[in-house]
Structure formats: C-alpha cells, structure tokens
Amino acid sequence: MTATIGHFLQNLCGEYSNQKQAFENPPLFAHIFLRYKPIEHLQPGSILLEQTYAVDPKHPYRLRVIRAEELTSGIIKLWNHTFKEPDRFSSATFDQDCREKIREEDLILLDHCHYQVRQLDDGFHGELEPGCRCIVRRDGKETYLVSSFHLQGDELSTLDRGHDPQTHDRCWGSIAGKFHFQRISHWAENIPETWL
C-alpha cells in the first residue's frame, strides 16, 4: 500500500449521515447512512460499503466491496464489487463474525463501474471512470450511471444519477443536487497497519 492510499482510507473509513440535509428538506432528500468499514482479511485496501435508509437501518439497499489501488502517482482506482448473495452479509458492517466470513468468491466485479480518485488541495475527488458504460437497471430500464464524490475532513458529498443510453436524459437520481453527509463515527482504527 502507498502513503496516498493509506491517507485516503484513513479519511474515508467511518459512518456518515445526511440527517441535517434530510430534516431541512425532506421532500427532496431521504435520510441515509453511508458506512465504510475495512475488511482486514481480504486484499489490502478492501472496504465494505453499506448504504441504508434511516427508516430501515438493518436492510442495506446497497452493499459493495471497494478495493483501493494506486495506478499512477496520486491517482487511486476504486475497484467496485457487488455480492452474489448480499442478504448473507447484510449485517456485516456491525457484526465482525459475519464480516470475517466474506470471501473473494462471494464477490462479483462490476465491469466499468470503478472510480478514479485524486487528492487535491480541498480533499479527495472521485468520479466514475469515463465512457458511460456502468449499466444500472432501474424500474425495468437500462441506464448508465454518472457518479462522483468529494471527501474533505468529516464531510462527504455524493451525486449519483442514471441516464438514458440513447438520449442521455436523466432517468433517476437527485434533482436537487448533491447529498451532503457528515461523519458521525470514525473507523480508521480498524485499518490494519500493514495497509498504511
């Protein structure tokens, strides 16, 4: 692992909530938790990503494993994986025994759905790799995902939108701009020293 990845993971790992934004504008922003937890026994840089609605915290609507790798100096690639059987690991963020059961063979690499991350003066900026090839099925229709995030200190902003492959019109995703999350728990202490 490089110093750049170690610094990024130390900044990323934790639990985030957009409670303030959701309470101020409930019609446009659901109250969501984002959680990034190291999976120590998998390849270095492997992070469990969980997204849940506050009204249903025990049933993540998105469960992924991302793996950080520095491609060239200062550019981090986040390899994006989904689970073959996500229900088996829905409690893995807070249940260490469940988390320790995750194996490489439980994961499916999501083609063309990886992120490139750069560290700039105002924090880390991540964007889905270019090419409009990360396909997401939503409401019976194929769309391509456009996704970005900005991590600075304890603040994380994200924007995910799905677009029609033919017309490039927005089909789903935020109409009111970015989701703004605040860190409520820091989990950097769970990162193995060998990763840093």
From Swiss-Prot:
Keywords: Lyase. One of its GO terms (molecular function) is lyase activity. It comes from the Bacteria. Its EC number is 4.-.-.-. The keyword Protein transport does not apply. Pfam families: CpeT (PF06206). Belongs to the CpcT/CpeT biliprotein lyase family. PANTHER family: CHROMOPHORE LYASE CRL, CHLOROPLASTIC. Covalently attaches a chromophore to Cys residue(s) of phycobiliproteins. This is Chromophore lyase CpcT/CpeT. The gene is cpcT.
